Amino acid sequence: MKILHVETGRQLLGGPQQVVYLMRGLVDRGHECTLVCPPGSGIDGAARQQGIPVRSLFCAGDIDLPFAYRLTQFIKESKPDIVHCHSRRGADVLGGLAASFADVPAVVSRRVDNTEMRVLAAIRYRPFVSIVAISEAVASALRNVGIEDEKIVTIRSAVDAAPFDRPYG
């Protein structure tokens, strides 16, 4: 499967690190992954170190319509089987919009359980065929704003334990 991941965060924090783990695991299982992210961002460097192809596109946030246009063009050009949107900073709203315009199915990962306005959640998640919640608390928050249970799947975050697997002393 050919998967285009969209992560617009600039730092390599928890969420973007999860994206790197996911892409590495998918590539190891024979899938083709490409990442769209801001140039020079933390995830840009981490993905390249893992040998993951990267397309650098700057995104200024949820209302950066030129980003949505550039992303739509790249989706049409690269022809992925699915688009996986990750962060909130434009990747979800604009990534879903771009995938819709390119007529490619999209999923989104949600990592936080903060409350959203029902009407905004309906707009935000409408383009996605599925929403990945990282915990039952996140899934519950989605249900509480009216997202259909059939659209939500819970997949917990990963941890690379190798850096912590050292003898004490």
Where are these regions (language model features)?
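N-terminal strand-loop element at the rim of the active site
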Residues: 5-66
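Alpha-helix capping/helix-boundary segments
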Residues: 42-43, 90-91, 137-139
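An amphipathic, basic-hydrophobic alpha-helix
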Residues: 38, 48-53, 58-83, 93, ...
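Acidic anion/phosphate-binding donor-loop and adjacent secondary structure
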Residues: 66, 140-144, 149-151, 158-169
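A conserved, positively charged/aromatic
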Residues: 100, 105-136, 140, 145-147
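Short His-centered aromatic/hydrophobic patch
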Residues: 85-92, 110-113
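Hydrophobic anchor at the start of a short beta-strand
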Residues: 32-34, 54, 106, 149-152
